[in-house]
Amino acid sequence: MSFPAMRNGVATFLMGAGLALGSGQTAHAQDSVTVKQFDDGGIYEGTFRNGRQHGTGTYRLPNGYEYTGDWIDGEIQGEGTARFPNGSIYSGQFLRGQPEGEGRIIFADGSQYEGDWVDGKITGQGVATYVDGSMYQGGFINAQKHGKGVLQRANGFVYDGDWLGGLEDGVAAITYPDGSIYEGTMSR
């Protein structure tokens, strides 16, 4: 199983949105809520320091993207929530405009992931739940199952073992819906 196509779009979209903003009219208020429109049609409503977004604020783009949360010196950093035009919602930590650290994304189809993010990508330990009732808990690299992990399907199938590039690969224990168990090595 894999995530919907949006899984790789998070980092690309965030970077493409120009979230470290510096153009537009100069804000004069410091630490007070100000509304500022940018050349790309984006609107920021929040606090500024030294003419840059700093503190908390909301940034909206004409395409439906919206970020609400922390800003440091014109960049999205800290805790926040990003809502994407396709209906996906990410809440968690950001660094340099990208998900970084702990975060949760709920995809438009209802599947979700909660766990570690690195450079805007699902990487590290986490839990993914899928619309078919399956759940995976374990390691990820670039949104693919990797390392140790447990996949449980709604029908009772359980794979507990090694993963490589999203595929079962290595030592594992498999419990089938009928209760039979296989322990051994899986290979591509």
Task: Please give the residue ranges for each predicted region.
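Bacterial N-terminal signal peptides that target proteins for export
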Residues: 1-13
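Conserved anchor residues at repeat-unit boundaries in beta-strand-based tandem repeats, strongest
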Residues: 43-54, 66-77, 89-100, 113-122, ...
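Intrinsic low-complexity tandem-repeat regions in disordered proteins
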Residues: 104, 110, 127, 133, ...
